Regions:
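Surface-exposed peri-terminal alpha-helical interaction modules
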Residues: 2-321
Length: 321
């Protein structure tokens, strides 16, 4: 009886496959013949393990640089996962509150992993080795992570990413180029003495400005902040859950993540009242602390007091250590 049921199940599956292949002008028999000769899939081929493990190429012989480059590659893979969820949220693929909440919670888990694992960079690098190999990486910088810049642009209105000094200069209808030139992180990538663009910023603009302009235009009206209003209804419990999740995402991206970098910078770049500059020439003491930038993706979800004190207590706690 079991064999008969299995045969019926196989017949049904073959019929479904035949229909699928017919719709695309393909012959199922040809593909079945190919399966006869194909090898079974294995783990190392599926994840392209050999290729993956060949991508870590330190620039020096200092052992801890391997940790440094590997961790940054892991970070970019997590950013890819965040963007994967965010694309579904902003492209109309999510149409109910429960799914919207699920996607936000997924992104929070990715950021939670990033923030909690940053001790690999803070505590897990030999300070003397780091001081040496970092000089071989100039002028590259984590500042140049385009995936993180895209996460920001997909999360909120571009006006919320403008440097505080320029907020009053811009109006909603201004061209994307006007906004791009005044984003907070561009101000943080200028020489602290001359005010000129660092080579780090020049390289980044040359490679990615066109892409970022496209993202600004594409997500003006469908970024995550715009999408969230479809699901905020005071009468539904899911609305309060979504608010909690979005606030958590805001904190991860704009407080905990930059301050994890700030803490690492304090540990590795400050000693005996002497402060070293970042490899990219960025002013990390002004660029990283949220209390200076006050970048908030969802300002309407925070009280005035919370916004006024954005990231302050965390910074004070870390500087004391």
């Amino acid at each position: 009886m079991e064999d008969v049921m299995l045969t019926q199940e196989l017949v049904k599956q073959i019929e479904q496959l035949t229909s699928k292949f017919d719709q695309n002008g393909q012959k199922l028999a040809d593909y079945l013949e190919g399966l006869v000769h194909a090898n079974f899939l294995n783990y190392w081929d599926y994840i392209q393990l050999d290729t993956l493990l060949s991508l870590q190429n330190p620039k020096t012989d200092l052992k801890d640089e391997m940790i440094f480059v590997t961790y940054h590659q892991i970070t970019e893979l997590y950013f890819k996962l965040v963007l994967w969820e965010m694309q579904q949220l902003t492209q109309g693929e999510v149409d109910e509150a429960a799914r919207f909440l699920e996607k936000i919670q997924r992104m929070n888990r990715y950021f939670e992993q990033l923030v909690s694992s940053f001790q690999v960079m803070t505590e897990g690098l030999d300070r003397e080795q780091f001081a040496k190999f970092r000089l071989a990486l100039t002028p590259s910088s984590g500042f140049q992570s385009v995936q993180y810049r895209i996460i920001e642009l997909m999360s909120t209105d571009v006006a919320n990413l403008v440097h505080p000094n320029y907020v009053l200069w811009l109006s909603p209808g201004d061209p994307a180029k006007e906004y791009l030139d005044k984003l907070y992180w561009k101000a943080g990538a200028r020489n602290t003495e001359t005010g000129q663009k660092t080579l780090t910023l020049q390289q980044f603009e040359q490679k990615y400005d066109t892409l970022l302009l496209e993202k600004i235009e594409a997500y003006r009206k469908k970024n995550l902040r715009q999408q969230m209003h479809r699901y905020l209804n005071e009468k539904e419990k899911k609305s309060s859950d979504i608010i909690v999740a979005l606030r958590e995402f805001d904190l991860y991206a704009n407080v905990h993540w930059p301050l994890a970098h700030f803490r690492a910078a304090v540990r590795h770049l400050v000693s005996h009242n002497a402060v070293k500059g970042a490899t990219g020439g960025t002013n990390w003491r002004k660029y990283l602390p949220p209390r200076f930038q006050r970048i908030i993706f969802f300002p309407e979800l925070w009280s005035d007091e919370e916004k006024d004190n954005w990231g302050k207590s965390w910074v004070l706690e870390q500087v004391k250590e």
